[in-house]
Amino acid sequence: MRQRVVRHVDARGVRVGWANGARDDARRRRRRRGGGGGDGARAVRGEDVYDATYAMRDRDYALDIAERSHATRARAAGDEWFYGELAYGDARRVLRRAARVVGWDDDDAESTSTSSTAGEFVDLGSGMGKMVTCAALTGLFARSRGVELLPELHDEASAALETFYERVRDAGMSVECSISLSLGNLLTFDVSNADVIYIHATCFTPELLHATAMKLANECKSGTRVLIMSKQLPEGWVFEAFDGGYMALAQPQTHWKLDCWMYEVRRGSSSS
């Protein structure tokens, strides 16, 4: 049974999402290749649902909410409040790679993996909830969870989640994934059952990065995969690079890409 967080959000001004020409070209290619079925067709429908959900909630809109929240009451040090997100196509690609999907870079590949797909995705600092819904749309996770520190951003993400469910129904899709968004501190959020963890750490202070690394090292099960943006975790401890350990991922509304460092938690054969 899906988990939903219902919040009342005041009406805001309409902001139309930025259209990426390269993304649209890729979508048209997937439509031609995918035909009436297969993972390529599902990827296109998922992207349509995603775009419809966040059409009025683009990156600049979310950044404005985060900035105003921080100005009203600072809950994070320095620029830790700063908002960032990934373009849908690259978010999907890196999630498929982390979930061990064979042919992760090909949307026409079958959605099968070398391990169970009934796992859990966690976004530490989930913002507008976009990675959480993207993970749900991949069909690779049984649960997709996020935690956000800023109340105003969490409220908007909760409203967007309601829109997401509406768009899924409108598209005649079925998303077999339990989705939850929580308000709270990432350092106290439960990650013990997570199979894939995503952290947009571009503006993390050294102190927060260290605390996050300690949390993951102490709480994650062996085999958990961690995707962290713009920052690196200390290798040779419990964090080992997997599958090359790196991807450059696109952001919406800019041509600049961000570094994504990819790790797997390894505790040895005697650890669980």
Model-derived regions, located:
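N-terminal chloroplast transit peptides
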Residues: M1-A11, A26
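Conserved class I S-adenosyl-L-methionine
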Residues: T117-G127
